[in-house]
Every structure is written in structure tokens, then in C-alpha cells.
């Protein structure tokens, strides 16, 4: 079985590597701007479904394709990827000292199986150090992440408490995916 990660996300690729999952990474283009909803859960679900439909075009020769999408919600206000430094600053200002939710919709499609999961990761944050926030904004690393949230580096020292499903916060429900891959292997051996 050949696994394709339909995402350019380095965080998602790293999650698969950390779990010993071999894959090929391919970008799938889906126009998220076509989605008009401002509800974070609906948005991430529709974006993932759109990517899943694009993935079906690649589905052949015993391939399994994984796609995902994430958004951040602060007080039920959606934060996608910041368009510029000012928007990134506004996102971080809203997160500062508050609870954030990372909503991740993960999906898999194979000749034998289709799976879709919407999960939420929560973290309560301490106040950001203003000079560290400025360095982060200057670095440009925020450009890669929904809501400018990078749990693996910038946000890490500011986490007061978090839910257990860190992989969801990093952009892919790996625990769920591992279970589905095992199920897929059993189904294909029947």
C-alpha cells in the first residue's frame, strides 16, 4: 500500500515520520477562499471534504491518501493562516493569556476505506512575552500555521494546560489515523 500525504505541511509530515509511517508528500490544491462560512468547525470540515474530493482524483493503484485541514478558534472566532504581519499580530493578541482551540479535520481514502475525523485540541495559554512575540513575528514562521499557532516552538513555553491529543493540535489526528491504517490492512488481507 502506497501512502500519500496530500498536504505541504511540514508539521504533518513530521508527525507521520515520528510514527514510522512511510509516505510520499504531494500538494493538493483546494480553494479554501471559496468557503464562505465563518464557523470554525464547519469551515475545517468543508475544507477537508474539498481536499478529500481532490484526493479521489489521485486514487488508483492501491494508493491510500491522507488529507487534513486545521483552523484555530479563540472565543469561537476563527483564525486561519494570517495574510500579513498585522493580521498575525491581531491573532496573537487575541490568543494572549486565553484558551485556544485547534480544530483539525483529518481524512483518509483508499480503495477499501474512507475515514473522516473532526477533533479539537485545547490549550490554555499564559501571557506572551512581548519581546518574544516580536521576534516570532519577525521570523515569519507564523506564515505556515493556522492562527499563527506553533505548539512545537513559539507557543510551547506559554502552555498552562492542554488536552491530551497533541497531534490534533499539530494538524493531524495520528492516533485515529493509525487505527484506520490497521483496519485498512485487515480489510485488504480478507
Curated annotation (Swiss-Prot):
Principal place of residence: cytoplasm
Any single GO CC term annotated in Swiss-Prot or TrEMBL for this entry: cytoplasm
GO MF, one example: nucleoside triphosphate diphosphatase activity
Annotated GO biological process: nucleotide metabolic process
Subcellular location: Cytoplasm
Cofactor(s) recorded in Swiss-Prot or TrEMBL: a divalent metal cation
Pfam family, any one: Maf
Keywords: Cytoplasm, Hydrolase, Nucleotide metabolism
InterPro entries cross-referenced by the UniProt entry: ITPase-like_fam, Maf-like
SUPFAM superfamilies, per database record: ITPase-like
Record's keyword annotation contains Cytoplasm: yes
Domain of life: Bacteria
Active-site residues from the entry: 69
EC number: 3.6.1.9
Class of this enzyme: hydrolase
Reaction(s) catalysed by this chain's protein: a ribonucleoside 5'-triphosphate + H2O = a ribonucleoside 5'-phosphate + diphosphate + H(+); a 2'-deoxyribonucleoside 5'-triphosphate + H2O = a 2'-deoxyribonucleoside 5'-phosphate + diphosphate + H(+)
PANTHER family documented for this protein: BIFUNCTIONAL DTTP/UTP PYROPHOSPHATASE/METHYLTRANSFERASE PROTEIN-RELATED, BIFUNCTIONAL DTTP_UTP PYROPHOSPHATASE_METHYLTRANSFERASE PROTEIN-RELATED
Function of the molecule: Nucleoside triphosphate pyrophosphatase. May have a dual role in cell division arrest and in preventing the incorporation of modified nucleotides into cellular nucleic acids.
Protein family membership: Belongs to the Maf family.
Name of protein: Nucleoside triphosphate pyrophosphatase
Amino acid at each position: 500500500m502506497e501512502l500519500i500525504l496530500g498536504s505541504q505541511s511540514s508539521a504533518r509530515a513530521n508527525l507521520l515520520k515520528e510514527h514510522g509511517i512511510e509516505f510520499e508528500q504531494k500538494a493538493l490544491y483546494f480553494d479554501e477562499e471559496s468557503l464562505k462560512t465563518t464557523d470554525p468547525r464547519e469551515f475545517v470540515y468543508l475544507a477537508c471534504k474539498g481536499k478529500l474530493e481532490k484526493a479521489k482524483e489521485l486514487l488508483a493503484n492501491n494508493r491510500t491518501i491522507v488529507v487534513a485541514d486545521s483552523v484555530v478558534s479563540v472565543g469561537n472566532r476563527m483564525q486561519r493562516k494570517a495574510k500579513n504581519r498585522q493580521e498575525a499580530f491581531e491573532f496573537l493578541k487575541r490568543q494572549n493569556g486565553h484558551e485556544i482551540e485547534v480544530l483539525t479535520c483529518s481524512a483518509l481514502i483508499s480503495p477499501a476505506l474512507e475515514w473522516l475525523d473532526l477533533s479539537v485540541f485545547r490549550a490554555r495559554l499564559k501571557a506572551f512575552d512581548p519581546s518574544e512575540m516580536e521576534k516570532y513575528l519577525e521570523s515569519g514562521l507564523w506564515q505556515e500555521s493556522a492562527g499563527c499557532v506553533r505548539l512545537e516552538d513559539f507557543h510551547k513555553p506559554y502552555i498552562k494546560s492542554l488536552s491530551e491529543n497533541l497531534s490534533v493540535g499539530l494538524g493531524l489526528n495520528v492516533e485515529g489515523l493509525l487505527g484506520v491504517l490497521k483496519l485498512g490492512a485487515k480489510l485488504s488481507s480478507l
